């Protein structure tokens, strides 16, 4: 710090002609001081009758007004007693390339240069001026830049404050959402534990992700603000310092200033986020209430033996499975296995004939890769052996059923189109969780058949409306070609 002050003082008492400390300093009317010997030599080179002017500012002066400057001479004497470090002197006063005094300013390159630099190829043809001649111009420019940077500092600080406020707001909002979610789930915790856990995990993940990104933005805003402050500090130091400090490296400062663009922080609008609300919970509760209501009509369903069906039925008349593949001995002693060719031959009706009222039952289909179940208006023995694959499964033929294929494809079967009336219209069903247990609700008077995914807390899988029940209907089960049994559940299970 002290060395910097001494360098500034030395610059003020340096002769502009010889660039050394003033010796027997003389001052002109304009205020510039020169060594007595330097000023005398300058007079000799001037025209005898020519007008004398200051070598620095070119202002005319009269010889009789030249006066010794004892004050400056005293400063020089004191300064000679102090030895500046050669590094600092080199850094401030001399050209790093040529070691000459830095006296000139190149307008094209915006650099302080020495007289050898001016004559070099690098600056040939450039406009050069004494530093004092351009100091005022850059004083104005840097002052304007300082004002602009101060404004940017205010903007940066405001952005920093905004991001902190948003971070606090997010934390408050997340905590508020947590409280609401916990309060809503308390009503039916024993049923909705999995929903609560899932939603809270998502919310916490969102909190961590958003706060992490906001923290990153905050760090970037702090760094941005610090960069502006550092540049402001640099400019303030230049503006308060000497001409040398003002102009040295000014090109880099101006480039940094021009290239500085305040980066806006990443934000996360709260109105666009998807958060679990009480309304979502209300949907779940409505489903549970609907399931609770239909379960009041749970009837104990069993299957009836049927000579037409090839299905395997358990002794308690609750389990139905497809027969094992038949072993066939062919010619030359070869052995092959085959399933029953008729898809419908494994279908079977429940023992209950339904002609009115509301009825509900559940079927366990866990571990099965294929099945069909629902309601049937009764077999058509004369026609069934002529029907292949799924063609019979249409409401117009008395089937209101859904099914599973390949372990993942859940479908409903509607009437075929006018172009293909014999083939059913297969409706792919979107189920988040493949059902292991299916509830079937038949409302005979309302002409509806509904299917519920008990595995997914009773969410509706599919509903047939406007059913035409012109005759008694029965529960229907078909294990398909999967030997794993499907089981009719008792009301107490």
UniProtKB/Swiss-Prot annotation:
N-acetylalanine PTM positions: 2
Q: List the Gene3D superfamilies hit by this protein, alphabetically.
A: 2.60.120.920, Classic Zinc Finger, Zinc/RING finger domain, C3HC4 (zinc finger)
Q: Which cysteines are joined by disulfide bonds?
A: none
Q: Can you summarize the PTM annotation of this record? A: Degraded in a proteasome-independent fashion in the absence of viral infection but in a proteasome-dependent fashion following exposure to restriction sensitive virus. Autoubiquitinated in a RING finger- and UBE2D2-dependent manner. Monoubiquitinated by TRIM21. Deubiquitinated by Yersinia YopJ. Ubiquitination may not lead to proteasomal degradation.
Q: Does the keyword Cell membrane apply?
A: no
Task: Tell me a GO biological process for this protein.
Answer: regulation of lipopolysaccharide-mediated signaling pathway
Record-annotated B30.2/SPRY domain positions? 281-493
Q: Zinc finger regions typed B box-type: which residues?
A: 90-131
Question: Where does this protein hold Zn(2+)?
Answer: 95, 98, 117, 123
Q: Which residues carry this modification: Phosphoserine?
A: 85
Q: Which UniProt keywords apply?
A: Acetylation, Antiviral defense, Autophagy, Coiled coil, Cytoplasm, Immunity, Innate immunity, Metal-binding, Nucleus, Phosphoprotein, Transferase, Ubl conjugation, Ubl conjugation pathway, Zinc, Zinc-finger
Pathway(s) it belongs to: Protein modification; protein ubiquitination
Give positions of region: Required for interaction with GABARAP and for autophagy.
185-198
Question: SMART domains of this UniProt entry?
Answer: BBOX, RING, SPRY
Catalytic activity line of the entry: S-ubiquitinyl-[E2 ubiquitin-conjugating enzyme]-L-cysteine + [acceptor protein]-L-lysine = [E2 ubiquitin-conjugating enzyme]-L-cysteine + N(6)-ubiquitinyl-[acceptor protein]-L-lysine
Q: Where, if anywhere, are coiled coils annotated?
A: 130-240
What are the start-end ranges of the zinc fingers (RING-type)?
Answer: 15-58
What does the record give as EC number? 2.3.2.27
Its annotated compartments are: Cytoplasm; Nucleus
Q: Does the keyword Ubl conjugation apply?
A: yes
Cellular component, GO annotation = nucleus; P-body
Q: What's the record's remark on domains?
A: The B box-type zinc finger domain and the coiled-coil domain contribute to the higher and low order multimerization respectively which is essential for restriction activity. The coiled coil domain is important for higher order multimerization by promoting the initial dimerization. The B30.2/SPRY domain acts as a capsid recognition domain. Polymorphisms in this domain explain the observed species-specific differences among orthologs.
Similarity comment? Belongs to the TRIM/RBCC family.
Q: What does this protein do?
A: Capsid-specific restriction factor that prevents infection from non-host-adapted retroviruses. Blocks viral replication early in the life cycle, after viral entry but before reverse transcription. In addition to acting as a capsid-specific restriction factor, also acts as a pattern recognition receptor that activates innate immune signaling in response to the retroviral capsid lattice.
Could you tell me which PANTHER family the record lists for this protein? E3 UBIQUITIN-PROTEIN LIGASE TRIM
What is the protein's name according to its record?
A: Tripartite motif-containing protein 5
Record organism: Hylobates lar
The uppermost taxa in this organism's lineage are: Eukaryota, Metazoa, Chordata, Craniata, Vertebrata
